[in-house]
C-alpha cells in the first residue's frame, strides 16, 4: 500500500515548493528564482511562423551609381550611414553612444571668469597635451589637492579639450579608458579611476555645468560599479559584513546594490528599492561607497534619456533630489573603502590574507616562460614604461627572450666568464668569416652545442657579419643593477666586454591561500 504524505501549504521553508507533477515520487523541489523572474513564453503563433517563412525582397543598390561617385562623395555617404546607424541604435537602447547629442553652448556664461575660477598655475601639464599623449609620462604630477581641483579652471580646460575632439579621437581615448578600467591590476588603481570620475562629476555639480553624455569621464561611470564590485568581491565580504551576525544578508544587499542576481525570496527589499536608497542608509562603508557610484550612474542615465527626448542640455541639480552629489567629497570613495578593510578585525586567517593582498600593490608572479617562435604575434609595451619592464618580453618577432630583474634584490648570482673559452670562440668565429656558406653555419652550431653541453656558468657568444639580427637576443645586467640589452646586429664585429649578470629575486612570505570566496553565494556569483 502506497503512503501519500500530505503537507500543509504554509509549512515549506523558503525556496522550497511542491512538485505538482510528481508529488508522490519526488516529494519537494527546490526552486531558485529572482523576484523579477518571468518565465519565457515558448508558444509561437501560426502567424509568426508564416511570417518568418516569407521571403522578403531586399532592395539592391545599383553598382553603376556607386562607381560614378567620387572618393569625397563616398566618404560623405559613409558618414551619413554611420550617423543613421547610431541614431537607430540610440532610439533602440536610449542609452548608448550618440554622436550628435546636443550639449549646452560653451559660451561666455561658462568661462573661468564667469564661474569665479582662478587660473591653474601648478606643476600639472596642460590638459590639451595630456589628452594628446593619451597616457601619463614617467614622474608626471597627477596628484592634486582638493582646492586645486575645485577652485581652478583645470577641469574646465579638460572639458573644453574633450568637447573639441572629433569622433575618432574620442572613441580612441574612450576605448583606452574602458580597457584600463576593466584590466586594472590592483584595487588602488581602480579606486583612483573611480575617484577621478566622481571628482569630475562633483565639479559639474558645484559649478552647475551642463552634462555631456559622450564625455570621457561621464560615460564610464556606469561601468565603474561592476569593476568596484569585482575588486571587492575578492575578499570574504560575508566575514567583513558580519559585525552584527548578519554577514550573509549584508552581502546579498551589496549584490543587489550593484545589480547582481540574488536568489533569496525573503530579502526585505527588492533590487530597485535598494538602489534608490541614499548612501547614509547603509551600515557598512563599502556599501556606502558603492551607493555613491550607483546613484551617480542612475542620475547620468536619466540625463541621457532626457537629452534624447528633449534635445536640450541638462544639469545634475535637476535630477539629484536627495542631494547625494552634495554629500560627496573628494577622496570619499577611497577613504570609505580604506576604513572598511583597515578597521575589520576577525580570527579568520584567510580573510585577513585576502585583505592584505587586496590593499597591496600589484606584483607579477611569473616563474618561467617559453621561447616562442619568431613568427609569433608581437606584444608591444608602452614606451613610457620603465626600462626594467621593457626588457620583460613574453614574445617578440625579433627578440624571443625572457628576462626579469627587480630592484629589491635579496640574492645575487654572479656568473663568471671563462677567458680561455672566449679566446677559442673568437678564433673560431674569425676563421668562419672567410667562409659564408653552409659549412660555417654547421661549425658554429656544433660549437654551440658542445658549449651548452658543458657545465659552465655562462657562454659568451660573438658575432660576425653572417649572423642575422633576428636570431637571438641577450640581456646583460651590470654591477650597478642597471639593465642593458645587447642585441646582435648585422655587420657588427665589435667584441662584447665582460659583463657580470645579476638575477634579482623578490621573496615574499606567503600565508594560507584559499580559493573559497564568499561561499554562501558561490553558485550564484558571476
UniProtKB/Swiss-Prot annotation:
One of its GO terms (cellular component) is viral tegument. Zn(2+) binds at residues 239, 344, 346, 351. GO terms for molecular function: zinc ion binding. Its main location: virion. The keyword Protein biosynthesis does not apply. GO terms for biological process: regulation of DNA-templated transcription. Pfam families: Herpes_UL69 (PF05459). The keyword Zinc applies. A zinc finger (CHC2-type) spans 239-351. It is found in: Virion tegument; Virion; Host nucleus; Host cytoplasm. Keywords: Host cytoplasm, Host nucleus, Metal-binding, Transcription, Transcription regulation, Virion, Virion tegument, Zinc, Zinc-finger. Belongs to the HHV-1 ICP27 protein family. Immediate early (EI) protein that plays many roles during productive infection including regulation of viral gene expression and nuclear export of intronless viral RNAs. This is mRNA export factor ICP27 homolog.
